[in-house]
């Protein structure tokens, strides 16, 4: 099985090293094409206004000055000697759940794999802070992901669907199981902090937070909060089919 790895935290991210160890428990044919720099929050964006610069680190490790989407395209269309059987994107430092999947470069890497006709999985590890220090239990994803991915590859899933895995913030032995979940919902709390530079011109920092909101029992959020691994199947068809039919009926047009 040929596996292509990418992420959005960059080629030097600890989570990418974790992902490679996970992948090597599944196959010896593992390739890495990851961003040269941190691309967090760039979602499913492409680099169109400047050239892509590819740097070969060794036989199967490459860094690209581009987004996670660029990396998957580069891997599938140029770097690999043949099509991969699986694209793995991650392991992200921090969960990618609920509405955050729309911002996530990690999820976007799996999206692009899916668009290119390759089975794809995004992996993210929840964390906590101890003072100003981020504590990420990478060992949890590393311990549980290989078997879970192996089982998923045996079971298979439909074309046009990617899988979004989130691992809870706990030790490997404290994980309470796996739940197949729905994408949850979080409330937005985005604020702009306006400041002035040395010449008096304004600039802004975006403070992106979340407010309180009800959490559905079957959601990815609920699974992670309960200490379970969350597995959410996401499809690329964004059509709201029920609303499409309702609008057609309301307007008296074909839908």
From Swiss-Prot:
Enzyme class: hydrolase
Cofactor note: Binds 1 divalent metal cation per subunit.
Keyword annotations from UniProtKB, A to Z: Cytoplasm, Hydrolase, Metal-binding, Nucleotide-binding
Pfam families per record: SurE (PF01975)
Subcellular compartments: Cytoplasm
GO molecular function: 3'-nucleotidase activity; 5'-nucleotidase activity; exopolyphosphatase activity; metal ion binding; nucleotide binding
Binding site for a divalent metal cation: 8-9, 40, 92
Reaction(s) this enzyme catalyzes, per UniProt: a ribonucleoside 5'-phosphate + H2O = a ribonucleoside + phosphate
GO CC field: cytoplasm
SUPFAM superfamilies: SurE-like
UniProt cofactor(s): a divalent metal cation
EC code(s) of this entry: 3.1.3.5
Top-level lineage group: Bacteria
Family: Belongs to the SurE nucleotidase family.
Described purpose of this protein according to its UniProt entry: Nucleotidase that shows phosphatase activity on nucleoside 5'-monophosphates.
NCBIfam families (UniProt xref): PRK00346.1-4, surE
PANTHER family membership: 5'-NUCLEOTIDASE SURE, 5'_3'-NUCLEOTIDASE SURE
Identification of the protein by name: 5'-nucleotidase SurE
Taxonomic source organism: Brucella abortus (strain S19)
Gene: surE
């Amino acid at each position: 099985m040929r596996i292509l790895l990418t992420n959005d935290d960059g080629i030097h991210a600890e989570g990418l090293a974790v992902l490679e160890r996970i992948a090597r428990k599944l196959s010896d044919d593992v390739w890495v094409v990851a961003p040269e720099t941190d691309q967090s929050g760039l979602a499913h964006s492409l680099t169109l206004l400047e050239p892509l610069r590819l740097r070969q680190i060794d036989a199967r490790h490459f860094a690209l000055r581009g987004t996670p989407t660029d990396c998957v395209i580069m891997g599938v269309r140029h770097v690999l000697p043949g099509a991969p059987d699986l694209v793995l994107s991650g392991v992200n430092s921090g969960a990618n759940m609920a509405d955050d999947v729309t911002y996530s470069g990690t999820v976007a890497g799996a999206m692009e794999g899916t668009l290119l006709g390759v089975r794809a999985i995004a992996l993210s590890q929840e964390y906590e802070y101890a003072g100003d220090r981020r504590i990420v239990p990478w060992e949890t994803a590393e311990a549980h992901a290989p078997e879970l991915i192996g089982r998923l590859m045996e079971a298979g899933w439909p074309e046009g669907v990617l899988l979004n895995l989130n691992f809870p913030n706990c030790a490997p032995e404290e994980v309470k199981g796996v739940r197949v979940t729905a994408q949850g919902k979080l409330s937005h709390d985005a604020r702009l902090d306006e400041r002035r530079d040395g010449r008096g011109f304004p600039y802004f920092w975006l403070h992106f937070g979340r407010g309180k909101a009800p959490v559905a029992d079957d959601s990815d959020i609920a699974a992670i909060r309960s200490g379970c691994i969350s597995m959410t199947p996401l499809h690329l068809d964004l059509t709201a089919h029920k609303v499409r039919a309702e609008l057609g009926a309301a307007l008296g047009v074909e839908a």
